[in-house]
Amino acid sequence: MPNRDRRTNRLLSLLSDEDYERLRPSLSPVVFDYKKSLYEALRPIERVYFPVDGVASLVITTADGSGAEVGTIGSEGFVGLPVCLGDRVAPSSVYVQVPGTALGMDARVFRTELERNPTLNLIMLRYAHAFFNQVAQSAACAHLHRVEQRCCRWLLMTRDRMPTGDFLLTHEFLGMMLGVRRTTVTDVMGALQKAGLIRYRRGHVTILDHQALEQRACECYEISRLEFDRLLGDTAVTPRTDKKHRLISEVG
């Protein structure tokens, strides 16, 4: 397994070499194709994923077929959190919104590794905490902030998860992510392009001015980013000298 993939995924990069080597034989490269379905709601979870690049979205679909994003996952995280919490059923559908790659693993094998490795288990619990905080922040954001602010936040979050500032994105999909009509997305993206913050062409977005996007985004972007750093920063996981346990250090 290429070391680049391990270093690129934030959670895998926090593991010691010894812990990672135990996982490595069970990990395999997976291509995240655009709109690929990773999980269907209320169906068993067979595999879990550590994204390397690309972005997956958790989507809730209502009885009339409408869908809205409730969470996003990229190279900072992990697709398959219910497995970490003792469940094997997906509570929502998960789709690839920005194509890329990931490292996949059988869900049963991963659950076994969690039970035998306290460091991996605690890393995943911290990630679950950070992710649920992000979901809560997004819910507040959807009620309190303007569409343009939310769109800028979403573009920034996606940019942070990609190797470059250029990625695939359609108005239709962004509309589902933000829970607004496609015409609204067209107006907002057009305004951002006119202001020189982005370039949008044939389903591709290029971020031209990251700083200006941050200024237009709501505070939710920075709040979520800092919370991930607090819970999953480079100093969050420190091996102890005793052979029996490797624990996550306290975070002030």
Can you name each region flagged by the protein language model?
Residues 1-33, 78, 83-84:
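Cyclic nucleotide-binding regulatory module and flanking cytosolic helices
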Residues 36-98:
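Cyclic nucleotide-binding regulatory domains
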